[in-house]
C-alpha cells in the first residue's frame, strides 16, 4: 500500500497521511480549513515497514481504512522532554 504525506501550511509539525492518489475526499472540510494548503512531502510504501516515526504501520493502515486519513499532530511538550532526557 502506498501512502501520501502532506505538510500543513498553517500548523508546524502537522502532517496528513492519505492513501496514495486520494483527493482529500474523506477529510472533513473543517480540518482542511485549519490545515491550510497541503504540501505533498513524500509517498511511503507501507508494504515493507512495520514502524513509522510515531506509530505502527498497522495503526496507520487502520486509520486510512476506517477514516480515509490520519492526522499527525506535533508531539506534546512532555514527550519532547522525555525524548531529550533518554
Swiss-Prot record:
Source domain of life: Bacteria
SUPFAM superfamilies: YcgL-like (SSF160191)
Domain YcgL: 1-85
Organism: Idiomarina loihiensis (strain ATCC BAA-735 / DSM 15497 / L2-TR)
Name under which the protein is recorded: YcgL domain-containing protein IL1825
Matching HAMAP family: UPF0745
Gene3D superfamilies (alphabetical): YcgL domain
Amino acid at each position: 500500500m502506498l501512502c501520501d504525506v502532506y505538510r500543513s501550511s498553517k500548523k508546524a509539525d502537522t502532517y496528513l497521511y492519505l492513501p496514495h492518489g486520494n483527493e482529500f475526499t474523506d477529510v472533513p472540510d473543517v480540518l482542511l480549513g485549519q490545515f491550510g494548503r497541503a504540501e505533498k512531502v513524500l509517498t511511503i510504501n507501507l508494504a515493507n515497514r512495520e514502524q513509522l516515526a510515531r506509530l505502527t504501520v498497522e495503526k496507520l493502515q487502520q486509520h486510512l481504512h476506517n477514516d480515509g486519513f490520519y492526522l499527525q499532530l506535533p508531539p506534546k511538550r512532555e514527550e519532547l522532554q522525555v525524548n531529550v532526557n533518554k
